[in-house]
Amino acid sequence: MLYVSDIISRFNGKLLCGDENMILDNFCKDTRIIKNGDIYVGIKGESFDGNNFYADAFDKGAKACILDNTTLVDTDRYGDKTIILVDNTLECIGKLAKYKRSLLNIPVVAITGSVGKTSTKDMVASVLSTKYKVLKTEGNNNNNIGLPFTILRYKDEDVMVIEMGMNHFGEISYLTDIVRPT
């Protein structure tokens, strides 16, 4: 299990308000699909700053937010919620996924390549699911943003089937360091 205190102690996080003993599960980076009880992670994109959507996440039921920019945070309004400040949310989520993976002793199949990664991942997961409970990459969330969220979705599966893609030099090495395929 992961706790707010793990982010504080292991990844230089700062608790702005809330419960450091809260269990962290059900991470989400998109307020359009956030569910009650999720942990919202505000990630900066090319044309948006996910930190700006923290209030929307709370209004839709998020129990905590992990942010790297708190200039707009209203702790008077959301002081009863858990808000964690980190240096960089994208780096934090990668480190958190790597830490969670280090706690797991299960087989992990990693699939990469130029063409056919998603189809191959789906076929391998389908075959394994006839005998095992499988966690697999959803769709093609196979980069330095999507892959950590896959690892963080782990509950009690027997095996993981992870798709790894790249769009910049060194990304496969970075993802392999998180996934540690067996």
Predicted feature locations:
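N-terminal leader/targeting and accessory segments in enzymes
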Residues: M1-K95
